């Protein structure tokens, strides 16, 4: 019965959108909606951060992460002790080596020169990827990016306060730097902030750039699910609850098993619930399980919305 009702809902959703909007604007802030534009799927990856804090725990977590991860991130700044060669050898998956500064949400307390030395050592050790921030002093960043290397460099920007209006300009500046992959992560103060990152992903595909674009915070959780489906290079998921490396990060198990972000899809539609709160709703479990059971490529996500009118103003171009 549930699957039949779900199918009927999907087929008739475009006719319901105008009625949904009127109902929501009257104050009913907890209704299902569908972002019903068809999207073409892009193959992406789930990255599981390994946070230690000890060498032995890191090795255990590498093994535990293997079934969930397409790629691992070794967060050296969060490890009290580590043997990088041993960690890289233990992983059957490609690894990103990150040594995050405190100003960008990490814990590395040494000098910038010391931090760069560790990243260079990671490249020599055979890390497939290394992450370096745009905030790195220019006299260190420029030669690092221009150096001969086998490792691919992820050039990253993090903003833990908001999603700045000049995000497009930032992207353009980063495109002018010799990095292999760009990473832009901002804080979502409103659900519509996610659209700025989705637009960057769309632009990066036209530009032929590999881009990781995500929003942090509760209102940014949808980006962690949808960005990889829209063409983002990868998304981050914690190994388990309590091992998040950024606000709003959800578990790798949820990304892979509930939202199926790595499943192959020819095209898909995005359904969801909007309201505040939305995370007490079990709709994402019920609907995504039902989609899987009926062989649908569609997805259902929670949209944490404070202002319904602004939400429809921002997202309406994506409705059919």
Feature-to-residue mapping (PLM):
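Active-site beta->alpha loop and helix N-cap motifs at the rims of alpha/beta catalytic domains
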Residues: 46-59, 65, 69-148, 154, ...
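Short, positively charged and aromatic/hydrophobic N-terminal segments
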Residues: 32-33, 38-41
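Methionine residue identity
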Residues: 1-2, 17
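Polybasic, lysine-rich low-complexity intrinsically disordered segments
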Residues: 21-23, 28, 38
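Catalytic alpha/beta core domains of metabolic enzymes, predominantly
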Residues: 136-267
């Amino acid at each position: 019965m549930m699957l039949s009702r779900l199918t009927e809902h999907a087929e008739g959703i475009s006719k319901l959108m105008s009625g949904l909007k009127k109902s929501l604007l009257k104050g009913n802030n907890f209704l299902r909606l569908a972002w019903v534009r068809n999207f073409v799927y892009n193959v992406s990856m789930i990255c599981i951060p390994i946070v230690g804090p000890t060498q032995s725990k890191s090795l255990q977590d590498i093994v535990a992460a293997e079934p969930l991860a397409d790629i691992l991130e070794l967060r050296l700044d969060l490890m009290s002790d580590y043997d990088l060669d041993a960690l890289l050898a233990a992983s059957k998956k490609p690894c990103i080596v990150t040594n995050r500064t405190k100003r960008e949400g990490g814990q590395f307390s040494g000098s910038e020169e010391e931090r760069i030395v560790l990243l260079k050592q990671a490249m020599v050790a055979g890390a497939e990827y290394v992450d370096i921030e745009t905030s790195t002093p220019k006299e260190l960043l420029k030669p690092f990016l221009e150096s001969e290397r086998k490792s691919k460099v992820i050039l990253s920007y993090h903003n833990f306060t908001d999603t700045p209006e000049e995000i497009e300009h930032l992207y353009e500046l980063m495109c002018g730097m010799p990095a292999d992959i760009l990473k832009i992560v901002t804080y979502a103060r409103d659900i519509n902030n996610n659209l700025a990152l989705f637009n960057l992903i769309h632009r990066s595909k036209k530009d032929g750039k590999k881009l990781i674009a995500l929003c942090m915070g509760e209102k940014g959780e949808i980006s962690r699910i949808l960005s990889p489906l829209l063409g983002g290079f990868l998304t981050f998921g914690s190994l388990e609850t309590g091992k998040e490396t950024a606000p709003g990060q959800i578990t790798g198990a949820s990304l892979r098993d509930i939202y199926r972000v790595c499943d192959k899809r020819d095209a898909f539609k995005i359904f969801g619930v909007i309201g505040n709160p939305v995370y007490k709703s079990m709709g994402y479990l019920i609907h995504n399980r039902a989609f899987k059971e009926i062989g649908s490529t569609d997805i259902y996500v929670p949209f944490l919305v404070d202002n319904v009118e602004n939400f429809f103003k921002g997202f309406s171009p994506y409705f059919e």
